[in-house]
Amino acid sequence: MSTTIDMPGSSKAAKAGKPVLVTTPSRPGGWKKGVAIMDFILRLGAIAAALGAAATMGLSDQTLPFFTQFFQFEASYDSFTTFQFFVITMALVAGYLVLSLPLSIVAVVRPHAAGPRLFLIILDTVFLTLATASGASAASIVYLAHNGNQDTNWIAICNQFGDFCAQTSGAVVSSLVAVLVFVLLIVMSALVLGKKH
C-alpha cells in the first residue's frame, strides 16, 4: 500500500514538482496472526463441544418406573458398545485439543513458523477422522433408537426412553459441531501454509 504526500522542501523531487512516495511498512504476521488467534478460539470451542458430547453421552441413563419380578427396564450408554466407543473417542479428542493449545499459542506468537502448523494439521486430520467415525456410528444407533428397523425386528425404544434418546441425540449433535470445527481448523491451517506472504 502506498501513499503520496506533497511536501515542500529542498529535495530534488520536491523541486521538480514530483510527488514523494512514502510506503508504510506492513506489520509482520499480519493476517496470519489473525488466523492463528481464530485457530486458538476455535480450539476452545471444539474442546467444549467434545467434552459436552462425551459428558452428555456418558451421563445418559434412564430407568422406566415399572419393572417385573425378573426385569428392570433401563437404558444407558454402556448398554451399547457404539456409545462406549463414542464416549472414549470424544474424551480422546477433547484431550488432544487441550494438548494442542500450546502449539496454537506458538502459532499466534510466531505466525510465520510453518512447523507447528504442519504438525497441527496432521494431527487435526487424524482426530477429525476419529471424531467423524464415532459421531457417525453413534448417529446410526440413535437413528435406530428413534425409528427401529422392521426388517430385523428392532423396535424403536424412544417412545419409552424419551430422556435417554434426547441426551444421546444431543451428544451426537455436539460431536458433529466438533467435527465441523476440525474441518475449519484444517482449512485455515492449509490456507496459511499455502500462502507465502
Curated annotation (Swiss-Prot):
Q: How does it sit in the membrane?
A: Multi-pass membrane protein
Which Pfam families does the annotation name? CASP_dom (PF04535)
Q: Where in the cell is it found?
A: Cell membrane
GO biological process: one example: cell wall organization
A cellular component annotation (GO) from this entry? plasma membrane
Cytoplasmic topological domain: 1-34, 106-117, 193-197
Keywords (A to Z) from UniProt: Cell membrane, Cell wall biogenesis/degradation, Membrane, Transmembrane, Transmembrane helix
Q: Which residues lie on this side of the membrane: Extracellular?
A: 56-84, 139-171
The UniProt transmembrane annotation reads 35-55, 85-105, 118-138, 172-192
Main localization of the protein described in the UniProt heading:
membrane
Which family is annotated? Belongs to the Casparian strip membrane proteins (CASP) family.
Assembly with partners or alone:
Homodimer and heterodimers.
Q: State what protein this is by name.
A: Casparian strip membrane protein 5
Organism lineage reads as: Eukaryota, Viridiplantae, Streptophyta, Embryophyta, Tracheophyta
